[in-house]
C-alpha cells in the first residue's frame, strides 16, 4: 500500500525502517496496531508517514488475516485465481487477473491495492512470469507452484 504514487526505489530504500516500525511484519502484531501506534508511526521520519497509508496497512493486514482464515493461506487465495498455473505475460503493467484480484481485495476492505500494484505483486510471488522469452531468467520460474501455507 505504501508504494501507491511513489517509486519502488523510494519504498525499497526504507525497507529496513519499515521492518522495524512494523514489528518485523508480524501479521498479528500489525493487526493489533491501535491509534497510539499509528500516531507514533506518523512521527517516525524513517518511514512513509502518510496517515491514510498507515491506516491502510493495518486494515489490509486484518483483511489479509481474514483471507488466510477463509482460504487456508493467502497463497491458496492467489493461486485459486489461476487454478495453480503460472501465467506467462510480457509487457503489460496490469491484466484482467490483476483487475479482478484488485477489485476483490477492495470489496473485502483493502485500500491502495490498485491493479498495477497487484500485477507487480503477482510477478513478485511468481503467479505471473513476466520475463521476455529471450531473457535468461524466463525459464527460472516454475510452471507449477510449490504450495505454501
Regions found by a protein language model. Name each.
Residues 1-149:
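HhH-family (HhH-GPD) DNA N-glycosylase catalytic core used in base-excision repair
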